[in-house]
């Protein structure tokens, strides 16, 4: 895949971004937005398949996804890429590097995407002067911990049907919070990538999607998914969908 040095760059402002309420605390004042705008580096546009960052690279910034979809992966012992997460517009990516100051995973664009770069040293400094910003990032870190716990529960205790139902509901909820249709969406990732994330074989993912389709729970046409009976899917996962 192409390295990220080919990315196009341009300047965007948090204060005028339609996704700012997803990335940032809603109570920021205009003057605080101005201070934040001043530290944001030029945003990047990435083509599908380009790396935003790679495991082992120095951690310097968080990235707010302005448009597009990403996956994060780590190399397993046998050399295969293990998918560890999917990130969409309005979400922050790159927090894996805060602890060790190096990234622990690769981040790859699943479609043409755009991100805003937030230099961490400046964001950390701003947090001392804007308490709501610091609190917001603590909440984001907490959400990552909760999600990791949810994935551990999912991989350890849930059947294939429950894992896939939880995954679809989680996507639905996240898309809905961004103003998209909750029950009608396109999967940006492959079935193989879904299987890697959920700890399922490709054949199991395809078979389970077909099972849901024949049972009238969903409609499947290639990557186009419609949730026809989301309530039955929710009953299947017993409230665990929010964590994956």
Sequence positions of predicted segments:
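Cyclic nucleotide-binding regulatory module and flanking cytosolic helices
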Residues: 1-48, 92-93, 97-98
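Short aromatic/basic micro-patch
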Residues: 43, 62, 86, 117, ...
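Glycine- and acidic-residue-biased ligand/ion/polar-headgroup-sensing regions
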Residues: 49, 60-73, 89-90
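Short phosphate-coordinating micro-motif centered on Lys-Gly-acidic
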Residues: 52-57
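A short beta-strand-loop-beta hairpin characteristic of the jelly-roll/cupin
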Residues: 70-82
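Cyclic-nucleotide recognition modules
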Residues: 83-146, 150
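Polybasic "coupling" helices that flank or enter modular domains
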Residues: 128-201
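Phosphate-/nucleic-acid-contacting segments
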Residues: 173-244
């Amino acid at each position: 895949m192409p390295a990220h040095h080919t990315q196009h760059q341009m300047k965007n402002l948090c204060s005028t971004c339609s996704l700012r309420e997803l990335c940032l605390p809603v109570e920021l004042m205009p003057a605080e937005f101005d201070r934040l705008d001043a530290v944001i580096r030029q945003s990047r546009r990435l083509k599908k398949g380009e790396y935003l960052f790679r495991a082992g690279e120095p951690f310097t910034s968080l990235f707010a996804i302005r448009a597009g979809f990403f996956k994060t992966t780590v190399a397993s012992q046998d050399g295969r890429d293990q998918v560890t997460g999917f990130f969409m517009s309005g979400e922050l990516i790159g927090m894996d590097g805060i602890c060790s100051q190096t990234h622990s995973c690769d981040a790859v664009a699943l479609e043409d995407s755009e991100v805003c770069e937030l230099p961490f040293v400046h964001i950390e400094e701003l947090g001392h002067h804007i308490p709501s910003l610091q609190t917001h990032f603590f909440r984001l870190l907490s959400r990552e911990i909760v999600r990791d716990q949810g994935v551990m529960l999912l991989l350890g205790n849930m059947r294939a049907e429950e894992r896939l139902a939880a995954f679809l509901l989680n996507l639905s909820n996240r898309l809905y919070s961004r103003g998209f249709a909750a029950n009608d969406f396109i999967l940006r990732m492959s079935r193989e990538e879904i299987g890697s994330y959920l700890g399922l074989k490709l054949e199991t993912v395809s078979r389970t999607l077909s099972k849901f389709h024949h049972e009238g729970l969903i409609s499947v046409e290639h990557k186009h998914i419609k949730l026809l009976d989301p309530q039955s899917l929710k009953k299947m996962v017993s409230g665990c969908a929010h964590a994956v």
